Amino acid sequence: MADTEPSPLFVFSTIAIIISTFVIFYFVQQSKKNTPVLKPDTFQKFPLIEKTRVSHNSSVYRFGLPKSTDRLGLPIGQHISIGATIGGKEVVRSYTPISTDDELGYFDLLIKTYENGNISKHVDSKKVGEYVEIRGPKGFFTYTPNMVKSFGMIAGGTGIAPMYQIITAILRNPADKTKISLIYANVTESDILLKSELDKWAEEHPDNFSVHYVLNEAPENWKGSVGFVTPEIIDSKLPKASDDSNLLLCGPPPMISAMKKAAVGLGFAKAKPVSKLGDQVFVF
């Protein structure tokens, strides 16, 4: 019997099937990567994989995700909740990671340990390899590139965390032209968290980012401001109130109360009891 060559239609169909199978396999594999891990209503256990002390009472805690290709799944500007049973009671506190979803396989939390802080002491007591229970995301602020022309930010202490996350997202995106002006208040110079990173950003992105430090107790030859954040400092260091400029606040309650009052005096809208996306003044 003479050999017969396969018909062109058969060859084409076979190639099409092979290509289709490969494409389907590729997208299935891709869908398994970069999987968001967080669940808003369910606490999940995440292992502590690294702890870095950044001041006498604050540390950056790095927690691992199930796979090295996983992402936390937290929109920029939102936060997570840490839960624990302490003294027979369920205690929950919210924190904003300083990492973004660009980091795969882990996320970082900046936490200050307070003497009476149940959750902060609970986290600080953990050793590498031990677990913390976390759920999320939560919050009413979700950052999108170029959502405003400029952000004025006022942070106190660990209130730098949500600001740091937003700044990171903006400066990493060449297409994002948002300008950021930050006032960061602390008690002493040693209390300034992430200072080297902030100073580096200010040096590398002078057209998009500036930072001004305020200390209650300043050393000699201090180049920042001394005392409290005043309306005069806000007026000179942050963008003026406008439709294209938002003011973001995060810090101790007494400070935030004073900042909201100062903002109104400078022409900003009065901050609402619960801030929502789109508010001219947003309190984390």
Swiss-Prot record:
Location of the protein in the cell: Mitochondrion outer membrane
Nucleotidyltransferase as a keyword of this entry, yes or no, is no
Q: Which family does it belong to?
A: Belongs to the flavoprotein pyridine nucleotide cytochrome reductase family.
**Transmembrane feature ranges:** 8-28
Tell me the keywords, alphabetical order. FAD, Flavoprotein, Membrane, Mitochondrion, Mitochondrion outer membrane, NAD, Oxidoreductase, Transferase, Transmembrane, Transmembrane helix
Q: What class of enzyme is it?
A: oxidoreductase
Pathway of action = Protein modification; peptidyl-diphthamide biosynthesis
**How would you summarize the oligomeric state and partners of this protein?**
Monomer. Component of the 2-(3-amino-3-carboxypropyl)histidine synthase complex composed of DPH1, DPH2, DPH3 and a NADH-dependent reductase, predominantly CBR1.
Pfam families xref list: FAD_binding_6, NAD_binding_1
Alphabetical list of InterPro entries matching this protein: CBR-like (IPR001834), Cbr1-like_FAD-bd_dom (IPR008333), FAD-bd_FR_type (IPR017927), Flavoprot_Pyr_Nucl_cyt_Rdtase (IPR001709), FNR_nucleotide-bd (IPR039261), OxRdtase_FAD/NAD-bd (IPR001433), Riboflavin_synthase-like_b-brl (IPR017938)
Superkingdom assignment: Eukaryota
Q: Which Gene3D superfamilies match?
A: Nucleotide-binding domain of ferredoxin-NADP reductase (FNR) module (3.40.50.80), Translation factors (2.40.30.10)
Cofactor(s) the record lists: FAD
Q: How does it sit in the membrane?
A: Single-pass membrane protein
GO cellular component annotations of the record:
endoplasmic reticulum; mitochondrial outer membrane; plasma membrane
User: What protein name does the entry list?
Assistant: NADH-cytochrome b5 reductase 1
Any idea which positions bind FAD? 124-139, 150-182
Main location (coarse class):
mitochondrion
User: What is the stated purpose of this protein?
Assistant: NADH-dependent reductase for DPH3 and cytochrome b5. Required for the first step of diphthamide biosynthesis, a post-translational modification of histidine which occurs in elongation factor 2. DPH1 and DPH2 transfer a 3-amino-3-carboxypropyl (ACP) group from S-adenosyl-L-methionine (SAM) to a histidine residue, the reaction is assisted by a reduction system comprising DPH3 and a NADH-dependent reductase, predominantly CBR1. By reducing DPH3, also involved in the formation of the tRNA wobble base modification mcm5s 2U (5-methoxycarbonylmethyl-2-thiouridine), mediated by the elongator complex.
What PANTHER family would the database entry show?
Answer: NADH-CYTOCHROME B5 REDUCTASE, NADH-CYTOCHROME B5 REDUCTASE-LIKE
Q: Which reaction does it catalyse?
A: 2 Fe(III)-[cytochrome b5] + NADH = 2 Fe(II)-[cytochrome b5] + NAD(+) + H(+); 2 Fe(3+)-[Dph3] + NADH = 2 Fe(2+)-[Dph3] + NAD(+) + H(+)
Q: Which GO biological process categories is it annotated with?
A: protein histidyl modification to diphthamide; tRNA wobble base 5-methoxycarbonylmethyl-2-thiouridinylation
Taxonomic lineage is: Eukaryota, Fungi, Dikarya, Ascomycota, Saccharomycotina
Recorded GO molecular functions are:
2-(3-amino-3-carboxypropyl)histidine synthase activity; cytochrome-b5 reductase activity, acting on NAD(P)H; NADH dehydrogenase activity
Q: Domain FAD-binding FR-type: where?
A: 41-144
